[in-house]
Amino acid sequence: MTPVHFSFTSAFILGLMGLAFHRTHLLSALLCLEGMMLSLFIALSLWALQMEATGYSVAPMLLLAFSACEASAGLA
């Protein structure tokens, strides 16, 4: 596992652990969800760049759109 993959995997796991342990406060739970979505977005973007597949380049943008919808629904 390269250091880049390790850092994004650990960022996702830290966000997941923060979500599991900070369920009492809504804002901290939403921030943990945003951290998880951001690490997934960067990981999917890097994966599409490494594979040099243009068909997979749409997936990070869809994930970013769903993440924005999740954040706006949570803060409403």
UniProtKB/Swiss-Prot annotation:
Gene coding for it: MT-ND4L
Regions that span the bilayer: 1-21, 29-49, 56-76
Protein function: Core subunit of the mitochondrial membrane respiratory chain NADH dehydrogenase (Complex I) which catalyzes electron transfer from NADH through the respiratory chain, using ubiquinone as an electron acceptor. Part of the enzyme membrane arm which is embedded in the lipid bilayer and involved in proton translocation.
Keyword Protein transport applies: no
Name the record gives this protein: NADH-ubiquinone oxidoreductase chain 4L
Gene3D superfamilies on file: 1.10.287.3510
Entry similarity comment: Belongs to the complex I subunit 4L family.
Membrane topology value: Multi-pass membrane protein
Organism annotation: Oncorhynchus masou
InterPro entries: NUOK/Mnh_C1-like (IPR039428)
Alphabetized UniProt keyword annotations: Electron transport, Membrane, Mitochondrion, NAD, Respiratory chain, Translocase, Transmembrane, Transmembrane helix, Transport, Ubiquinone
Reaction equation(s) it catalyzes: a ubiquinone + NADH + 5 H(+)(in) = a ubiquinol + NAD(+) + 4 H(+)(out)
Subcellular localization: Mitochondrion membrane
Superkingdom, taxonomy of origin: Eukaryota
Enzyme Commission number(s) of this protein: 7.1.1.2
GO cellular component, one term: respiratory chain complex I
A Pfam family annotated for this UniProt entry: Oxidored_q2
Gene Ontology molecular function: NADH dehydrogenase (ubiquinone) activity
